[in-house]
Amino acid sequence: MAAKDIRFGEDARARMVRGVNVLANAVKATLGPKGRNVVLEKSFGAPTITKDGVSVAKEIELADKFENMGAQMVKEVASKTSDNAGDGTTTATVLAQALIREGMKAVAAGMNPMDLKRGIDKAVTSAVEELKKISKPCSTSKEIAQVGSISANSDTDIGELIAKAMDKVGKEGVITVEEGSGLENELDVVEGMQFDRGYLSPYFINNPQSMQAELEDPFILLHDKKISNVRDLLPILEGVAKAGKPLLIVAEDVEGEALATLVVNTIRGIVKVCAVKAPGFGDRRKAMLEDMAILTGGTVISEEVGLSLEKATINDLGRAKKVQVSKENTTIIDGAGDTADIEARIKQIKAQIEETTSDYDREKLQERVAKLAGGVAVIKVGAATEVEMKEKKARVEDALHATRAAVEEGIVPGGGVALIRAKAAIAELKGANEDQNHGIAIALRAMEAPLREIVTNAGDEPSVVLNRVAEGTGAFGYNAANGEFGDMIEFGILDPTKVTRSALQNAASIAGLMITTEAMVAEAPKKEEPAAPGGGMGGMGGMDF
C-alpha cells in the first residue's frame, strides 16, 4: 500500500478552501444575464465556449490533491443540483462558497464546527419552508416561456419554443432535443404513438410522394413471435378482407412465405397490408406491445395468454384512425382504446417510474407514458457552427429541465430575490446556543450571495442594490439586464422553486461536511528516481570513427 500524506486542522481546511475558491470563482463568472463566458480546452477539436455552470465545474481538476478534494466536493453540489432540478448549478456553487468561507472563519475563531453545522441546517430547513410559501404554481404558457428563457440565459426564442412544445404534448409529454440542420430552431410534434421501426418491404408503400405506407382506419394485429407460415395468417386476412379495411401487422418479424403473400396481396389490391417489426427487445418489447394493445383496444396474440395466430379472430385486433409507416418509423394516430384503460396503464407505468433506480429505465418509462398520453415533441436546435450548436443544445436542455421543475413545484421571483425574502422571514430564528446562532447567521449571510454575484457581474455595486431589494417586499427586485428595479414576475424573471430549493439544500449539505472536516488523507507524491547514467563499453577510448 502506497504511503499517504495526511493534513490536520487549519492546514487541511485552508487547502480545501483554496480549491473551493478556484472552482467557485470560475463558475460564478457565468451567473446572471450579464455573466461571462468560460472557454474550455478540449483534447481534440475546437475549444468549447459555455455559460453553463456545471459544464465549467466538470472540467476542473487541480494539481494539489488537497485543494482538488475541496474543488471536487463543490463540483458535487453543482452536479447534484443539475441532476435534481436541471438548473441552478451556478447558484448552488455560489451558495456553497459563501457558506464554506464564512464557516471556516468561524471554525478558525474557535467555534464548535458541529454547532455551526446544526445552525446552518436549522436556517436552511426554515428557509425551504419559506420558499414553499412564496412559491406560485406555474401553469400558463407565458410563465413556462419566461422560466425557459431565464434558464437558457435570457434567450426568449428557446423559452417560447419550449412553451409551444408543452402546449402540444402536455406537461407529461416527452420533449427531446436534437441537433438541427439549419440556422433556425424548429419544433416537430409527433402526435400519437411513434416507434422506431419501419416497413419490412418497400412494396407496402402506397403514397409515392411521402414514401410512406398510409393506412386509414386500419385493423392492427399485435403478435410477439415471428410469422413465417402464411396459413397462420389466413383466417385474419380473410376477416379483414371481408370488412374491407387495411391491416397493420406488428410482430417480432414477418419473413419468407408470409411476407411474400402479404406483398402480393398489397400489389394486387386484394387487402391493403403493411408489416413492421415490434419495437424494443425482451421484456421491454412485451411491455410496448401491451401498451399498443391498450391504446388501440386490441389484444397481444401471445401463447403466454393462451392465444394462437390461427385461432385469432378479427375481434382480437386493435383499431386506429390512421397509421403512417415510413422507412424508419411507424406512427399510430388516435387509437380506439378505452380512455379509462389508457389512464390506468399510465398510472401503472408512473408507479414503476417512482420505483426504478436506473436513469435509463426511467427515461424509457417516461417515453412510454408520453406515447400513451398523446405525443412526442422534438426541438431541433439550429446554429451556424458546431461550437455554437453544442453550446445552444446544452442551454436548451437546461431550459427544458428548469421548465419541468417549474411545472412540478411552482415558481418564485428570480434574480436571487426569493432567497432574500426567505432570509427576511427567518431573521429572528434562534439556535440552542451561541455557536448555533452564529451558524444561522452564516446561512442568512450566504443567502445574499447569489444576488450579490448577479449584481457584481452586471458591473453595479452589490451592497447598494441588496439594501434596496431588502427594503422592498414580495417580488420587488433588481433586473440586472437593464439595471431597473421593479416586480420580478412582471419582468418575467422567474426561477423554479425546485431549483432554488435544491441549490440551497445541496450547498448546505456539502458546506456542513467541509466545516466539520478535521483531517485529510491523500496519496503521498512519488519521488522520481534519477535515471541511471548511460554508459558505453569500457576500453573503447581513442577509437577513431
Swiss-Prot record:
CDD domains: GroEL (cd03344). Gene3D superfamilies: GroEL, GroEL-like equatorial domain, TCP-1-like chaperonin intermediate domain. One of its GO terms (cellular component) is cytoplasm. Transmembrane segments: none annotated. One of its GO terms (biological process) is protein refolding. It is found in: Cytoplasm. It catalyses: ATP + H2O + a folded polypeptide = ADP + phosphate + an unfolded polypeptide. This is Chaperonin GroEL 2. Belongs to the chaperonin (HSP60) family. Its main location: cytoplasm. It comes from the Bacteria. Keywords: ATP-binding, Chaperone, Cytoplasm, Isomerase, Nucleotide-binding, Plasmid.
